[in-house]
């Protein structure tokens, strides 16, 4: 029985690390393509904008799916956050979660056809910048664990 639990725990940890590395890659692709799209809005051609827009949507949808899986894997953290408050829990993680929720919401609104230069589009851009900063902080705090998993 102990061996079975050990194997199960190893599988869970391996899955968490696979999801974490996939999250990192999809985050980088989404952030890079979002910044590229913003730069394209300042004068580059329509074809390039269409390519990067499609790329950004794809990378961001993969990111959204992975974040949902990641949150599910760490659901106890969120459950305790709602039950007992922030306490000594990571404020960066809590704010990052909120920013991501807002960023994903504005992204979905933009997907529905809202103009990216609208107020929602501008909010999406600034939330994206905040997300990049907070995600980098979140990643650096966990970097040693990510590397040790390789």
Model-based region annotation:
Residues 2-150:
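Membrane-embedded alpha-helical bundles that constitute the cytochrome b-like, heme-associated redox core
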């Amino acid at each position: 029985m102990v061996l079975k639990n050990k194997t199960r725990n190893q599988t869970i940890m391996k899955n968490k690390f696979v999801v974490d590395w996939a999250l990192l890659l999809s985050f980088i692709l989404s952030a890079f393509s979002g910044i590229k799209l913003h730069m394209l809005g300042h004068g580059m051609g329509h074809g390039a904008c269409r390519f990067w827009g499609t790329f950004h949507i794809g990378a961001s949808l993969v990111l959204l799916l992975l974040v949902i899986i990641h949150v599910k894997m760490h659901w106890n953290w969120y459950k305790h956050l709602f039950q007992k408050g922030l306490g000594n829990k990571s404020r960066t993680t809590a704010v990052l979660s909120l920013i991501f929720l807002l960023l994903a919401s504005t992204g979905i609104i933009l997907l529905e056809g809202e103009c990216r230069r609208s107020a929602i589009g501008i909010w999406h851009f600034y939330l994206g910048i905040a997300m990049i900063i907070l995600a980098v902080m979140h990643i650096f705090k966990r970097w040693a664990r990510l590397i040790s998993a390789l």
